Amino acid sequence: MFSLPGYEYFLGFLIIAAAVPILALVTNLIVAPKGRTGERKLTYESGMEPIGGAWIQFNIRYYMFALVFVIFDVETVFLYPWAVAFNRLGLLAFIEALIFIAILVIALAYAWRKGALEWS
């Protein structure tokens, strides 16, 4: 039989990781109510009767703030490993990180100047 020594725990983890979500979905299919009555089709709105339609337009400003947040969140993901390995990387990596931060600061200044961060 094919055997990889030391990988038994990993194989067990993979089996459990695949079995738990499948078991949860199957349990939901068995236990969940089947019928969709009129009251169950209504949109839930803090326990009150829904007012207006469920589809509303959001201001584009929400998307702009979300985009700026994602950009700086990704910056954190890239800078954290660099900060952890800072002592071993040397001067070239430090200069590269400074260039990366400078590009992001320029992008932030551009967004600020264009009014993307203004809430009006």
From Swiss-Prot:
Lineage top rank: taxon: Bacteria
Swiss-Prot/TrEMBL GO biological process terms: photosynthesis, light reaction
Pfam hit, one: Oxidored_q4
Tagged with keyword Nucleotide-binding: no
A GO-annotated cellular component: plasma membrane-derived thylakoid membrane
Any one GO molecular-function label of the UniProt entry: NADH dehydrogenase (ubiquinone) activity
Catalysis: reaction(s): a plastoquinone + NADH + (n+1) H(+)(in) = a plastoquinol + NAD(+) + n H(+)(out); a plastoquinone + NADPH + (n+1) H(+)(in) = a plastoquinol + NADP(+) + n H(+)(out)
Family of the protein in this entry: Belongs to the complex I subunit 3 family.
Protein name per Swiss-Prot or TrEMBL: NAD(P)H-quinone oxidoreductase subunit 3
Organism: Prochlorococcus marinus (strain MIT 9515)
